[in-house]
């Protein structure tokens, strides 16, 4: 979407579900496996490093353990080592809004909370840790927070996006505007397509300035990793809202209809049925619907060919989990495009 000619050379994941999707969608990319075990000196350098260290320890929906050794979010250290060694032209880091407030550990300080060695010093937050590490290895950075509904999605998922580039550069300004998105054919293979139009993408990008996209619409709850469970869970930062798998069992979308229609228009794709029947014949949240809510191409994570050997229940659960951990592609593209063009404004 941002740089359609870019080639994905490496990925790094160890979970079976995401690994299956990555292998199918990026068949020529090498999965380097456990990021903590990679010797980056043996890996051929690349132009762009993009990642989002696991968010569960930063998310308001998680246990808020923070970014420190022994936590999943602490995997940022491995990403930072990759950046330090490979020296890419552009770094993109994405995470939950909790990165703005979750505590962090830094090798620059003796403690895990206050800076400056005293109890009254400022608290180091996860985003501050990332910025400090990047500065320490010679990278400047710009960042923003963007909600999925700011680009027209029917839910409010907020994400922090950061771009960084070698210090002293004026910025890694992209020469391309939004390209065509990628969608899948009948066999679920990715190829060039038109899931999101250039006009729609650029139109919703302008909402960054107004901050009004979605302001007048009632939004669906954000997909979460808990949606596969019977009772689901609340969306991040929306503890008083019902879980998505409860809302979709309502006979009519009612107040949510305008938000759904808007996303259908932007993606050029009709919303799938929001529920499917369980083995017991009861309606339950459809993983095809959450895939659509996240703005993913049809079949990107739900194509049955990906899940050979999985039961229907297991397939649904792994897809809901991936959607709950994911980010809307148009949301990410809008944020990256905005940040990489700040110096040109």
Give each language-model segment a name:
Residues 1-38:
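SAM cofactor-binding core of SAM-dependent methyltransferases
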Residues 2, 25, 41, 85-86, ...:
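Alpha-helix C-cap/termination motif
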Residues 11, 32, 50, 92-93:
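Generic enzyme active-site microenvironment
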Residues 19, 23, 80, 131, ...:
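Non-transmembrane alpha-helical segments in soluble domains
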């Amino acid at each position: 979407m941002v740089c359609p000619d870019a080639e994905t050379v490496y990925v790094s994941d160890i979970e079976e579900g995401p690994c299956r999707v990555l292998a199918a969608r990026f068949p020529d990319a090498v999965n380097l496996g456990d990021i903590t075990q990679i010797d980056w000196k043996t890996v051929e350098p690349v132009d762009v490093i993009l990642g989002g260290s696991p968010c569960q320890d930063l998310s308001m929906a998680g246990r808020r353990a923070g970014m420190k050794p022994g936590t999943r979010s602490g995997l940022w250290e491995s990403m930072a080592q990759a950046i330090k060694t490979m020296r890419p032209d552009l770094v993109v880091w994405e995470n939950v809004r909790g990165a703005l407030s979750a505590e962090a550990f830094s090798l620059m300080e003796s403690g895990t909370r206050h800076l400056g060695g005293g109890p009254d010093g400022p608290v180091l937050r996860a985003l501050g840790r990332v910025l400090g590490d990047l500065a320490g290895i010679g990278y400047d950075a710009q960042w923003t927070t963007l909600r999925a509904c700011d680009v027209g999605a029917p839910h409010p998922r907020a994400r922090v996006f950061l771009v960084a580039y070698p210090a002293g550069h004026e910025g890694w300004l992209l020469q391309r505007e939004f390209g065509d998105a990628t969608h899948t054919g009948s066999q679920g293979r990715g190829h060039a397509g038109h899931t999101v139009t250039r006009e729609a993408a650029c139109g919703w990008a302008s909402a960054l300035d107004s901050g009004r996209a979605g302001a007048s619409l009632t939004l669906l709850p954000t997909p979460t990793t808990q949606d596969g469970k019977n009772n689901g869970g609340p969306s991040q930062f929306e503890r008083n809202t019902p879980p998505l798998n409860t809302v979709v069992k309502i006979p009519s979308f009612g107040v949510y209809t305008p938000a759904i229609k808007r996303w259908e228009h932007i993606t050029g794709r009709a919303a799938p049925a929001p529920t499917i029947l369980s083995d017991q014949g009861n309606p339950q949240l459809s993983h095809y619907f959450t895939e659509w809510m996240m703005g993913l191409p049809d079949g990107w994570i739900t194509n049955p060919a990906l899940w050979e050997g999985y039961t229907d229940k297991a397939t649904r659960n792994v897809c809901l989990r991936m959607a709950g951990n994911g980010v809307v592609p148009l949301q990410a593209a809008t944020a990256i495009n905005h940040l990489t063009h700040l110096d040109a404004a």
